[in-house]
């Protein structure tokens, strides 16, 4: 019955969920971040992840905090000259023709009834400047676009206003939109396309080489036009070392890299059987997946090689009061599989405890590998060779087959190939040395115009878990 109502009124449920954040599935978590490391720490408000499938919900991807700016709201603005310095940007001025409308105070209800203010004050394409003198019965409005007003409203202004005329209006830098400001500094033939992501008060850019000369102008615009942004940084290199850190530079604002971000769960897919499950997070970072899953009652074993990331994960777990459900490890992933998962017989239904944390006998084990650059290649460690022989070692070769828990693998990866399914299949075969009987590949998001992120999901075959040759 509940499923019937959900399917029938799915769109309505989404709208209600978006409008009432903390009524529906409110979740507040806190995430911290290291300055030197850029393992970004947040005071987290978790965005919608489907923890049935452990990946971002495609239907809700538009809610993620990513800003893509274009010139769609300022198509009529063409700058006469490009700005190249911060001083020029700060002192920018131009003159534009605007429409001045003057009415008497007693006419305000009439104009309001005919949607004058809905078509001006509330319309970003037709902004309004309002001049009011409390000692006078006169009200003056400067309209940006007379031609955008509905014809009946234009007729009303013509007939009922004291005056409507064209005036020259001074426009300053603080008056223009973000898109117009970008048009002043970006000079190319592909339009204004400046993207950035936000984490709390931090805006994170990936400025391409061709725009490096104007990166500080871009940062200045972002920090001026988005009042919640206090710090703008640029990633100067790819994530490159074993700790997955990156080289960043401060472009504008405060040198404060500790971000606080509260994320509300707006809409999510959740199975109540999830409370019986165990999440094994191989590359947990500062703990976003681990904390979210534990908030839903899931037991979690979370590992990260980076000691700073593991430290912040422990701190976030304490802040979010889920320490009874999350165990943190700071180990190499291969050692984690052998010394924690295998030696503790985590895949054995008879194992009901790990380091003081209770495990459910009936629960499945979800292995999440969110390190897209190398996760596929790391899958090969599910089957390892004995160091002194060619014998294969499986994670569950020390467990009776009838007592084995199911292991569901969620492996994230990148691909730049148009035939990504074929390319991923080849990489899977090369990594684990056999064909998987069944798996799914789901598109997660676009990383760049030529690179996409995918999630590979499959139930790990018993032959792999027991270390059997194909």
Swiss-Prot record:
Subcellular location: Mitochondrion matrix; Nucleus; Cytoplasm
Signal sequence residues: none
Pfam family of the protein (one): TYW2_N_2
SUPFAM superfamilies: S-adenosyl-L-methionine-dependent methyltransferases
Cellular component GO terms, alphabetical: mitochondrial matrix; nucleus
Major localisation: mitochondrion
Chemical reaction(s) catalysed: guanosine(37) in tRNA + S-adenosyl-L-methionine = N(1)-methylguanosine(37) in tRNA + S-adenosyl-L-homocysteine + H(+)
PROSITE patterns listed in its UniProt record: SAM_MT_TRM5_TYW2
UniProt binding sites for S-adenosyl-L-methionine: 304-305, 332-333, 370
GO molecular function, one term: tRNA (guanine(37)-N1)-methyltransferase activity
Superkingdom, natural source: Eukaryota
The protein's role, per its UniProt record: Specifically methylates the N1 position of guanosine-37 in various cytoplasmic and mitochondrial tRNAs. Methylation is not dependent on the nature of the nucleoside 5' of the target nucleoside. This is the first step in the biosynthesis of wybutosine (yW), a modified base adjacent to the anticodon of tRNAs and required for accurate decoding.
Family listed: Belongs to the class I-like SAM-binding methyltransferase superfamily. TRM5/TYW2 family.
Subunit architecture: Monomer.
Stated name of the protein: tRNA (guanine(37)-N(1))-methyltransferase
């Amino acid at each position: 019955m509940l499923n019937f109502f959900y399917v029938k009124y799915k769109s309505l449920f989404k709208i209600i969920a978006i409008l009432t954040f903390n009524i529906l599935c409110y979740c507040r978590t806190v995430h911290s971040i290291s300055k030197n490391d850029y393992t970004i720490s947040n005071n987290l408000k978790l965005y919608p992840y489907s923890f049935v499938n452990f990946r971002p919900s495609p239907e809700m991807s538009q809610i993620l905090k990513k800003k893509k700016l274009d010139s769609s709201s300022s198509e009529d603005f063409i700058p006469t000259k490009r700005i190249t310095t911060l001083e020029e940007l700060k002192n920018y001025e131009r003159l534009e023709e605007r429409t001045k409308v003057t009415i008497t105070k007693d006419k305000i209800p009439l104009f309001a009834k005919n949607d004058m203010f809905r078509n001006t004050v509330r319309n970003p394409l037709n902004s309004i400047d309002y001049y009011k003198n409390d000692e006078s019965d006169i009200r003056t409005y400067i309209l940006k676009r007379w031609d955008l007003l509905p014809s009946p409203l234009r007729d009303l202004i013509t007939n009922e206003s004291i005056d409507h005329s064209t005036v020259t209006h001074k426009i300053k830098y603080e008056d223009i939109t973000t898109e117009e400001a970008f048009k002043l500094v970006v000079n190319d033939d592909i339009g204004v396309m400046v993207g950035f992501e936000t984490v709390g008060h931090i805006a994170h850019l990936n400025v391409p080489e061709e725009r490096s000369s104007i990166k500080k102008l871009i940062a200045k615009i972002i920090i001026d036009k988005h009042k919640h942004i206090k710090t703008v940084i640029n990633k100067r290199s790819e994530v490159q070392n074993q700790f997955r850190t990156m080289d960043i530079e401060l472009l504008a604002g405060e040198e404060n890299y500790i971000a606080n971000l509260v994320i509300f769960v707006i809409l999510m897919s959740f199975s109540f059987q999830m409370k019986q499950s165990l999440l094994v997070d191989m590359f947990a970072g500062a703990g976003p997946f681990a904390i979210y899953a534990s908030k839903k009652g899931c037991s979690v074993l979370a590992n990260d090689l980076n000691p700073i990331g593991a430290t912040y994960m422990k701190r976030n777990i304490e802040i979010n009061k889920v320490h009874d459900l999350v165990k943190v490890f700071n180990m190499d992933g291969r050692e984690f599989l052998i010394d924690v998962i295998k030696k503790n017989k985590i895949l054995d239904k008879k194992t009901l405890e790990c380091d003081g944390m209770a495990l459910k006998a009936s629960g499945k084990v979800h292995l999440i590998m969110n390190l897209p650059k190398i996760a596929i290649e790391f899958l090969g460690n599910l089957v390892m060779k004995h160091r002194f022989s060619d014998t294969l070692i499986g994670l569950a070769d020390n467990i009776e087959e009838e007592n084995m828990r199911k292991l569901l693998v969620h492996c994230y990866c990148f691909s730049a190939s148009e035939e990504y399914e074929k390319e991923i299949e080849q990489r899977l075969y090369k990594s684990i040395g056999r064909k998987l009987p069944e798996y799914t590949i789901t598109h997660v998001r676009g990383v760049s115009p030529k690179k996409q992120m995918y999630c590979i999901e499959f139930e790990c075959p018993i032959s792999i878990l027991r270390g059997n040759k194909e």
